[in-house]
Amino acid sequence: MKYYLIVGEASGDLHASHLMKALLKEDPKAEFRFFGGDMMSAVGGTRVRHYRELAYMGIIAVLLHLRTILRNMAFCKRDIVEWRPDAVILVDYPGFNLKIAKFVHEHTKIPVYYYISPKIWAWKEYRIKEIKRNVDELFSILPFEVPFFEQKHHYPIHYVGNPTAEEVRQFRAAYNVSGEEFRHEHGLDERPIIALLAGSRKQEIAGNLPQMIAAARRFGSYQLVLAAAPGIDAEFYDAFIGGSDVHVVRGETYALLSHADTALVTSGTATLETALFRVPQVVCYNTALPKLVGFLRRLMLKVKYVSLVNLIADREVVPELVANTFSEANIAEQLKRLLPDGAARREMLEGYEEVWRKIGEDSPSERTAKEMVLKVKK
């Protein structure tokens, strides 16, 4: 069978690569063609575009690159029609993928499977109409999405477990590098580590990293280690950390979290990864026009939280400094509460255990692959 996959960011590349491996187990003759990244390419198949050509966020960035986005979308539509896959698999990235779903539904008879649901429970809930009309099967990775889709909107979905939890479990089972070995390999001293996870897109990194570094530097008895995002070159980071005391690791985020004492994390999948490694964290997300964004967030968002940790727990487990609450001083204040072995740190770690329990121990890649192959072969 032939599978056409589309992702738009680094986390999607990771999750899709695991799904592709699982699809190959269920369908050894599977062929892949995709918009994706290096991890998907390592599994095999034909990459027609790198996700970096799609990964624009924010109104200004999208407008500046609108011609590129529209050109890629037109190419994607033509490519699907010409290749004639047995299924189109969309992974998150709804701004692009829902338009592709509409096209495929209206112009072909190819089934559309959505892996990692658009977060319409947070905003743009009206998109449920598009999903119902254009998506044949939706595979969810967040437990609270089940009542949202099935009870509120009467749209049956598959909850398959969480791929991040699966990936963390697999890594921890195989990883055996000691703290001493990790420090020696990366030229670190014996001080405890503050991990900096500043996002996977250049706009995010530029908006968050400088103040994250400034806040963390207030704690001289700790050393700062930055997890570089895949696809972002060293020269880009040098503009923010060149010649400073910030160490950089590349392609070793999970190894860093295995040895970190605490972390500053840009909102996204990384907040859940950090929690699953049981590293206390402060969630940070800077925006342009923070006061306006803070007001619009209160006005438009339908959820109380932005981090997956708090959304899954349905309460505040980790502090969120977003838009108008994001500042060097606020980051430092929240970080200070977590560094000693005090009550705030212990309460956060207890909250992490609650998140683990709610996610469960299913293997989402395998469950999703089995369902997809079964439906395609009908």
Report residues per predicted region:
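Nucleotide-activated sugar donor-binding and catalytic core shared by glycosyltransferases
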Residues: M1-K378
